[in-house]
């Protein structure tokens, strides 16, 4: 191989760049003053499990009373106008409706688990209703 001529390069001093790099690194690692603290977040699923335990312990109604009452009146208008309801009748309808929905979701969850899934899907609800004999 042929030798090449090396040209002289201007030196910048050996220690100056190192000192500059050290100050940059120190500036980056130092905590930012007045920084906004990130809000605490639970891991995915933790809050869901907590809510499941909470609602399984409780006995209160889960659907708000007035929206449910409006829904009952709207459905009843299709059959007969000017129907009147006792408050105890609306409460009985709400208790029965919520009990039905809770059982349906329990069966739906079992259908999803049977399919080796943890997420319920419309096909699970359809299967649960079909097994119950509600829908042919």
From Swiss-Prot:
Pfam families named in the record: Histone (PF00125)
Q: Which residues carry this modification: Phosphoserine?
A: 11
The UniProt similarity line reads: Belongs to the histone H3 family.
**Organism listed in the record:** Strongylocentrotus purpuratus (Purple sea urchin)
- The answer to whether keyword Signal applies is no
SUPFAM superfamilies given in the database record: Histone-fold
Indicate the transmembrane segments per the record: none
Tell me yes or no: is Acetylation among this UniProt entry's keywords: yes
Name listed for the protein in its UniProt record: Histone H3, embryonic
Query: Which of the residues bear the PTM N6-methylated lysine?
Result: 5, 10, 28, 37, 80
CDD domains in alphabetical order: HFD_H3
Residues annotated as carrying N6-acetyllysine in the record are 10, 15, 24
Write out the function statement from the record.
Core component of nucleosome. Nucleosomes wrap and compact DNA into chromatin, limiting DNA accessibility to the cellular machineries which require DNA as a template. Histones thereby play a central role in transcription regulation, DNA repair, DNA replication and chromosomal stability. DNA accessibility is regulated via a complex set of post-translational modifications of histones, also called histone code, and nucleosome remodeling.
Keywords, alphabetical: Acetylation, Chromosome, DNA-binding, Methylation, Nucleosome core, Nucleus, Phosphoprotein
Query: A Gene Ontology CC term for this entry?
Result: nucleosome
The entry's comment on post-translational modification says: Acetylation is generally linked to gene activation. Methylation at Lys-5 is linked to gene activation. Methylation at Lys-10 is linked to gene repression.
Q: Which GO terms describe its molecular function?
A: DNA binding; protein heterodimerization activity; structural constituent of chromatin
